[in-house]
Regions:
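C-terminal, non-catalytic "cap/extension" segments appended to globular domains
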Residues: 2-147
Length: 147
């Protein structure tokens, strides 16, 4: 139970981090001439609820290597977590509550991996689980209370 609580907390913190990146990049590309450090700390404080250090005026946003080496990518991490939660719930409800079964592996291989890039990610998750990407499964997995 303690590990599950830790994993839930870790994922929720990571989700806020990912959302911070996505919001910042959107604003950065819409107006690259603005004060990006002020923008960075504005978004960090709104999304992550972290107070910026006093009297700090350094380009903290630029310390994130993704902005230069893998721009407009961070949302993919969150999409992956959303898809994983939906696949997990689908397997638990249609195959077995135990994810690590031969049948679950076969479903993933045959229906998810073998089609490769034949379908875009949104169509693929719909074909495999029967519904479009639904964040409710991520919320259920990461926001439920563990007793």
């Amino acid at each position: 139970p303690e590990l599950a609580k830790f994993q839930q907390a870790q994922m929720l913190i990571q989700a806020r981090w990912m959302i911070t990146f996505v919001f910042f990049e959107k604003e950065l590309y819409e107006n690259p001439d603005q004060d990006l450090n002020t923008l960075w700390w504005k978004i960090v404080s709104e999304v992550q609820l972290v107070t910026p250090p006093e009297n700090r005026n350094q380009p903290d946003w630029a310390a994130k290597i993704h902005f230069t080496l893998a721009p407009v990518y961070y949302q993919n991490y969150l999409l992956g977590e959303l898809m994983a939660a939906q696949l997990l719930r689908h397997i638990e409800t249609t195959i077995s509550p135990d994810f690590f079964t031969k049948e679950a592996g076969e479903l993933l291989i045959e229906q998810f991996f073998k089609p490769g890039a034949l379908y875009n990610w949104n169509e693929k998750i719909r074909r495999v689980t029967g519904e479009k990407l639904n964040p409710a499964y991520f919320v259920e997995l990461n926001c439920k209370s563990s007793k």
